[in-house]
Amino acid sequence: MGSADDRRFEVLRAIVADFVATKEPIGSKTLVERHNLGVSSATVRNDMAVLEAEGYITQPHTSSGRVPTEKGYREFVDRIDNVKPLSSSERRAILNFLESGVDLDDVLRRAVRLLAQLTRQVAIVQYPTLSTSSVRHLEVVALTPARLLLVVITDTGRVDQRIVELGDAIDEHELSKLRDMLGQAMEGKPLAQASIAVSDLASHLNGSDRLGDAVGRAATVLVETLVEHTEERLLLGGTANLTRNTADFGGSLRSVLEALEEQVVVLRLLAAQQEAGKVTVRIGHETEAEQMAGASVVSTAYGSSGKVYGGMGVVGPTRMDYPGTIANVAAVALYIGEVLGSR
């Protein structure tokens, strides 16, 4: 890339930085005064004319300065050389706050609240999906001799409870054997494999006695409820942050809020996050969702030991502090994974 192209990118970078900070269209005189561009105002005007002709900036009003377009923001984001890492005190504060969570729900609620505060955008965190989880522990509790409570705890800390109605009452000895058999079949296995194992166990016993019947009924509940009908859940925080930037959405705020409420679009975007530590930025129409055309989504995956638990990120206007947002999303995702992986 030639020096003229490099210089024009520095002009674009300055326009993005100033517009994000001030919300005001930026003129050539302002750029020369605020930034050490090393060229005259006339040269900056010429560079801005080229940037506008190529679609990187636009003039919103006849006598105003220029503002970045989606293409301009994309060029800016693609050429971020390095993201300034958070300070050690900031990282420690994030980790301490998340570690104080008493369980999975509390950790994720804290994460979404923290990310919304750090970025001043809407924060979104996807619950760990059962399809990517393994069974850490299975507990069987007798509510009555003929009514059981199954408690499945995954390696991500997710807890699911289901009731099983038995055909015949079982005694303490049979309950203990049932607990051992189901645990041996499922614990330590991914959910899909655990469901196959518990189904095979039920088929082998084939309801031959009271214990076999109990295993069959428990297996049916575990397979049908916990595996085949997994629920995608999403936590949102900081929705009010969007309403403070209504003008940035150019009349599209309502559709963005509707997309967040419906969750389908956001879940699709988060589902595309398959690699923890890699942050993806989608600007405006890059979200491929008409409702989100006025917004940007900065997202990543969180997980532990190379395993992805779910996606997370922020939604905000295209006029966004991209370097700061990327750094905060990456940091919170890293520490969610650390906290959940250590439990």
From Swiss-Prot:
SUPFAM superfamilies (UniProt xref): GAF domain-like, Winged helix' DNA-binding domain
Gene Ontology molecular function terms on file: DNA binding
GO biological process: one example: negative regulation of DNA-templated transcription
Keyword Transcription applies: yes
UniProt keywords, alphabetically: Repressor, Stress response, Transcription, Transcription regulation
Pfam families: HrcA
Family: Belongs to the HrcA family.
Classification via PANTHER family: HEAT-INDUCIBLE TRANSCRIPTION REPRESSOR HRCA
Function description: Negative regulator of class I heat shock genes (grpE-dnaK-dnaJ and groELS operons). Prevents heat-shock induction of these operons.
Annotated protein name in UniProt: Heat-inducible transcription repressor HrcA
Organism of this sequence: Mycolicibacterium smegmatis (strain ATCC 700084 / mc(2)155)
Phylogenetic lineage: Bacteria, Bacillati, Actinomycetota, Actinomycetes, Mycobacteriales
